[in-house]
Amino acid sequence: DLEALKRCLAVLALGEPLVMFPEGTRQSGPTVHPLFDGAAYLAIKAGVPIVPVGFGGTEGVMPKGSKMIYPRKCSVVIGQPIFPPIAQDGRLPRSATTELTAELRVALQVVFDLAKQKVGQTI
């Protein structure tokens, strides 16, 4: 959604934080699903780092399809910032976005696994 990307860039241009879920929706299971390239694209375009965040124990709080919220122990793990490549001539090849997305997926899996371990979930 081009309009949404423009709004996100405007938020980042103001120096404000932006939260994205690069999988596009809540997922279940032990692995991070394939990511959309939007987070990497925005990081490269705005020249800002991506901070991977992993959540553990949230599947039981509000299971997909549920309208109820259940009290459960959850954990949040914040990873190290991932700095996007900087284009010397103002443009980067499309592969830079793909590579940053792949790096983000690995980092998200690490923090996701740590967050699950903190609440006693097996990985």
Segments (PLM) and residue ranges:
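Non-catalytic C-terminal accessory region of glycerolipid acyltransferases
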Residues: 2-123
